Amino acid sequence: IDRYKNYWEITLKDKKKYQSRSLVLTCPYPQLKKLAKKYLNKKLLNLNVKMHPNITAMLVVKNHKEIPLSSIKTDTDVISWIANENSKKRFRSPLGLWTLQSSVKWANKNINKYKKKTRSTNSFFISEFCKLIGFNKNEVIFSNIHGWKYSYNFKKTVLSSYWDERQSFGVCGDWFLGSKAEDAWSSAFDLYKKIKKNPLIKNKRV
């Protein structure tokens, strides 16, 4: 990412370049500093942000039976949260659809190596789920696992978003405010209000 007189230029891995008058980044804090450190002010650079990883699995279970619950929070070392997707009534399916989220402790231990042993990690995750719910592992007919190295920041920062009208440069993300999906929306809305109040200074050299 480079800033010139009155525009931004982004260079991709394939060397393609894109220019724009304004730039808004929404990415985890460690990646933000790596991409745009020289364009951030001291207040943003000095935020106390600790990002935690998460590993999530999506499962399909045959012989689906109606289960009267929408989600479960657990205190096990491996799984922290289980969602029963069928309970949301967004669609009808004869199959059981589930989403699992790992505990922070287990994700910290496995986030850097799960891709090298995806099959065994996935199998272990499914086994832990079946123990909790009471399913037979053979009933799981599909599963997919994915990890985010920088998934959560549990502590709110002193900022809700960042906007520099001189550079026409903004930043938003859930990590400004917490770990929930709503925090991402709130941060983006806060950035919108800042841009509306202090829009781009046209032709301003920086």
Regions picked out by a protein language model, each given a short descriptive name:
Residues 88, 92-149:
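Flavin-binding catalytic cores
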Residues 1-9:
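A conserved short coil-to-beta-strand element within the FAD-binding core of flavoproteins
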Residues 13-15:
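Glycine-centered tight beta-turn/hairpin loop motif at sheet-sheet or coil-to-beta transitions
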Residues 24-26, 59, 100, 143, ...:
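Generic structural signal for small/hydrophobic residues in well-ordered secondary structure
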Residues 47, 194-206:
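Active-site-proximal substrate-binding core of FAD-dependent oxidoreductases
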Residues 88-94, 142-171, 175-177:
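FAD-binding beta-loop-beta segment adjacent to the flavin cofactor pocket
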Residues 17-70, 135:
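Central helical "cap/lid" subdomain
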Residues 163, 168, 173-199:
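A conserved FAD-binding loop/helix module that cradles the flavin
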